[in-house]
Design a protein with these regions (language model features):
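Bilobed periplasmic-binding protein/Venus flytrap-like ligand-binding cleft at the lobe interface
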Residues: 157, 177, 269, 334-336
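C-terminal lid/capping helical subdomain adjacent to the catalytic/cofactor pocket in oxidative enzymes
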Residues: 324, 334-356
Length: 356
């Protein structure tokens, strides 16, 4: 029996990627797509690539058919999910939120960084965090709850936190990272990471042939990265916009303990990372001397990790590459839904990028 799926915010870039993945999923049936701006428009009129594939029509976000779904993905701006998730859960619908509304454990931290009131902080205690490779227990618990007939809420990790944390977590959890000093994260994303609404930074004439840092010292993904890695007030995160449609590269410079500096070799580090991610289909740890490329992961739910050990400076440099729209958004949400509904986490998800 197929899982009936709805997508709120389906006309945005992450929403459109969700449509692509859900329509190709053997266990999912897409029954509702919403967009307040495009309500009444056929999907194929907004995205012609779906011509002949689906005859769905966009409805408004308050469409009653959402409550008849088994799962609803919410790909909406921050604070918008809070307006719908409680009612959907009360109707027995499991929710997979791609926004930041339920990612942070502490509502006061959310309110400080997003300058908005959190209207359902009680859900932060029960939601699962959607980064399967690092929080498998959360999703296993959610799957158990769903099997018992309970609707669940999964807060899917953000794009920058996903690439950054996958690159850094094995070293952090191994105890190699020094207790003091900044952890520097320099990340670059394609323009789709900024969403579909155009602004002065993402306009073609501004973004083309240009690299630009933004949100320096104040980007909202900072507390999420710190929460995942357990590095409170230590992450110096600087995102950059690149003239790419999609793709994200995050380079993390981790200060090492004296013992790690003295004893580790690059081969040790690579072996540890490969063991850490053993059995995790979507994470590929590259051999020593190799570095990841966004072109190797775009269009897939895969992540590539490259490692370099700089003993002179006493740091480990870990770089992660993902597709910001797939592993950083829609693909990760589908991966989480697969786990919750008892399917193989790989079901319906692409793993190999076009080689050229």
């Amino acid at each position: 029996m197929s899982v009936k799926v709805g997508i709120v915010g389906a006309a945005g870039y992450a929403g459109a990627e969700l449509i692509r993945l859900v329509l190709g999923h053997p266990e999912f049936e897409l029954t509702a797509i919403t967009s307040n701006a495009d309500a009444g428009q056929p999907l194929s009129a907004v995205y012609p690539s779906f011509t002949g594939v689906s005859d769905l029509v966009f409805t408004t976000h308050d469409a009653p058919e959402l409550k008849n779904c088994d799962a609803v993905f919410l790909a909406v701006p921050h604070t918008a999910a809070m307006a719908q998730v409680p009612a959907l859960l009360a109707s027995g619908v499991s929710c997979f939120d791609l926004s930041a509304d339920y990612r942070l454990n502490d509502a006061s931290v959310f309110e400080a960084w997003y300058a908005a009131e959190h209207t359902s902080p009680e859900l932060l205690k029960t939601r699962a965090f959607g980064l399967p490779e690092l929080f498998c227990q959360d999703l296993e618990t959610a799957a158990s709850d769903h099997a018992d007939g309970k609707p669940v809420l999964v807060a899917c990790a953000g794009c920058y936190p996903t690439a950054t944390s996958l690159a850094a977590a094995p070293a952090v959890r191994a105890g190699w990272v020094a207790e003091n000093g900044p952890v520097v994260v320099d990340a670059i994303s394609g323009v789709t990471g900024a969403g579909k609404s155009c602004n002065a930074r993402t306009h073609f004439c501004s973004a083309d042939e240009n690299l630009e840092a933004y949100g320096v010292g104040k980007h909202r993904h900072t507390p999420e990265i710190e929460q995942i890695l357990g590095l409170t007030d230590r992450v110096v995160f600087t995102p950059h916009l690149a003239p790419l449609k999609r793709g994200l590269l995050s380079t993390v410079t981790l200060p090492l303990t004296p013992q790690a500096i003295d004893t580790l070799t690059l081969e040790d580090v690579v072996d540890h990372y490969k063991q850490f991610y053993a059995g995790r289909t979507f994470v590929r740890v590259l051999d020593a001397g190799q570095q990841p490329k966004t072109a190797s992961v775009v269009g897939t739910n895969a992540a590539q990790i490259g490692l370099a050990l700089n003993k002179r400076a006493g740091v480990l440099v870990a770089t992660g590459a993902i597709d910001n729209l797939c592993k950083g958004a829609a693909g990760q949400a589908v991966q989480c839904a697969n786990i919750v509904f008892g399917f193989d986490e790989r079901r319906g998800l692409p793993t190999v990028a076009c080689p050229v």
